[in-house]
């Protein structure tokens, strides 16, 4: 049997909280936002993050100053494959490791954010088959418009079930929004505008369109925006475009004062949001939460495959007038010319949509989840 070294809880310390949300940024960022909120609520609270060695958490969690405990991943096959036969053994190994972490840090509550890190945490929190273990209360948070398998299982045993939007598929869930880091929710775009534009080499005057398609970029967004570059420049609109580290962008030379700044990725999203007047982006749960939190009008372009959850993520914001949903197949240079450019030139409409976006979001979601966690733990 493998032996693990785990950071243990100091005697006499505050509450011990485990956040379980690894793999993708959509699971990790809400977990870290809640971790930050817990520290703001009570600096004595100990937060431990669960993750796997192959997820983004191996970089993101240490950067934010939290201990990370690794467990074996438990990917849930979507279709019957040979991996389904390996699932029971993988679950047992991961639950055993998670229990070791729970015991070592003397966890008072576990907050799960879905994905293959959360499922072992939910299963390990119980008293076990022989009913000899100390049960740890569980809180489930679902960021997506359609709940995943892990959170559906966790919701059955959870003390509190939270969701980003109504009708997530988790009965009785309390809608709290998506936890977003304070550097975004507290962002003063007006105050940072000049600094942000200087950071990216954008002109002080004139509208700026921000374009990004997630951590890997999006080809359809790249082709549509770059294809309309001459018309954007002619209208005096600058572009800040994160095209993805694996993609290249062919942008024709344009004259005038407007600039087209193309970068592989954006490490300072706070400055990117502050520099922009509108956004063209995908509609992952975290993207929608951040864009609405900062009050930016958006053209949301859901992924054209999967279960359609990206469109559902954007619907509440769009219903309030804070954005538009554009099918991937309809985002073309012509659409940018006919729809995006006129909006960026209409300051009144931009202001109205920005206010609607900010009003539809949940800027205090991280603090609310933190308060619920403390209440459940005690």
UniProtKB/Swiss-Prot annotation:
PANTHER family for the chain: GLYCOSYLTRANSFERASE, UDP-N-ACETYLGLUCOSAMINE--N-ACETYLMURAMYL-(PENTAPEPTIDE) PYROPHOSPHORYL-UNDECAPRENOL N-ACETYLGLUCOSAMINE TRANSFERASE 1
A Pfam entry, by short name: Glyco_tran_28_C
UniProt cross-references to HAMAP family, sorted A to Z: MurG (MF_00033)
Gene Ontology biological process terms from the UniProt entry: carbohydrate metabolic process; cell division; cell wall organization; lipid glycosylation; peptidoglycan biosynthetic process; regulation of cell shape
Protein's name according to its UniProt entry: UDP-N-acetylglucosamine--N-acetylmuramyl-(pentapeptide) pyrophosphoryl-undecaprenol N-acetylglucosamine transferase
Source domain of life: Bacteria
Reaction(s) catalysed (UniProt annotation): di-trans,octa-cis-undecaprenyl diphospho-N-acetyl-alpha-D-muramoyl-L-alanyl-D-glutamyl-meso-2,6-diaminopimeloyl-D-alanyl-D-alanine + UDP-N-acetyl-alpha-D-glucosamine = di-trans,octa-cis-undecaprenyl diphospho-[N-acetyl-alpha-D-glucosaminyl-(1->4)]-N-acetyl-alpha-D-muramoyl-L-alanyl-D-glutamyl-meso-2,6-diaminopimeloyl-D-alanyl-D-alanine + UDP + H(+)
Pathway assigned to this chain's UniProt record: Cell wall biogenesis; peptidoglycan biosynthesis
Recorded topology in the membrane: Peripheral membrane protein
Record has Phosphoprotein as a keyword: no
Assigned keywords, A-Z: Cell cycle, Cell division, Cell membrane, Cell shape, Cell wall biogenesis/degradation, Glycosyltransferase, Membrane, Peptidoglycan synthesis, Transferase
Stored InterPro entries: GlcNAc_MurG, Glyco_trans_28_C, GlycoTrans_28_N
Function, in words: Cell wall formation. Catalyzes the transfer of a GlcNAc subunit on undecaprenyl-pyrophosphoryl-MurNAc-pentapeptide (lipid intermediate I) to form undecaprenyl-pyrophosphoryl-MurNAc-(pentapeptide)GlcNAc (lipid intermediate II).
GO cellular component: plasma membrane
């Amino acid at each position: 049997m493998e032996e693990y070294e785990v950071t243990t809880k100091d005697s006499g310390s505050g509450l011990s909280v485990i956040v379980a949300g690894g793999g993708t940024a959509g699971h990790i960022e809400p977990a870290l936002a809640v971790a930050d909120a817990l520290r703001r609520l009570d600096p004595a609270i100990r937060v431990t993050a669960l993750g796997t060695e192959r997820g983004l958490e191996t970089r993101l969690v240490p950067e934010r100053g939290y201990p990370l405990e690794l467990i074996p991943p438990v990917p849930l096959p979507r279709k019957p494959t040979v991996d389904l036969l390996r699932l029971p053994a993988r679950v047992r190994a991961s639950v055993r490791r998670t229990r070791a972490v729970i015991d070592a840090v003397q966890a008072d509550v576990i907050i799960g954010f879905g994905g293959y890190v959360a499922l072992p945490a939910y299963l390990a929190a119980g008293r076990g088959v022989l009913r000899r273990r100390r049960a740890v209360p569980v809180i489930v948070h679902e960021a997506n418009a359609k709940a995943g398998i892990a959170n559906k299982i966790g919701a059955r045993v959870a003390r509190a079930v939270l969701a980003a939007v109504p009708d997530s598929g988790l009965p009785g869930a309390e809608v709290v929004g998506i936890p977003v880091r304070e550097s975004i929710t507290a962002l003063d775009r007006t105050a940072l505008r000049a600094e942000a534009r200087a950071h990216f080499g954008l002109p002080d005057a004139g509208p700026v369109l921000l374009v990004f398609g997630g951590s890997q970029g999006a080809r359809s967004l790249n082709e549509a925006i770059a294809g309309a570059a001459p018309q954007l420049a002619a209208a005096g609109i600058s572009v800040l475009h994160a095209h993805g580290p694996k993609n290249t962008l062919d942008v024709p030379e344009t004259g005038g004062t407007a600039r087209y700044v193309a970068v592989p990725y954006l490490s300072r999203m706070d400055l990117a949001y502050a520099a922009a007047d509108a956004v063209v982006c995908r509609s992952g749960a975290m993207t929608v939460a951040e864009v609405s939190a900062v009050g930016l009008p958006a053209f949301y372009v859901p992924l054209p495959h999967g279960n359609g959850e990206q469109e559902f993520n954007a619907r509440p914001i769009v219903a309030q007038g804070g954005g538009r949903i554009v099918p991937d197949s309809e985002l073309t240079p012509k659409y940018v010319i006919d729809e995006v450019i006129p909006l960026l030139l209409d300051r009144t409409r931009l202001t109205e949509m920005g206010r609607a976006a900010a009003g539809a979001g949940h800027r205090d979601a991280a603090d609310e989840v933190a308060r619920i966690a403390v209440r459940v733990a005690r």
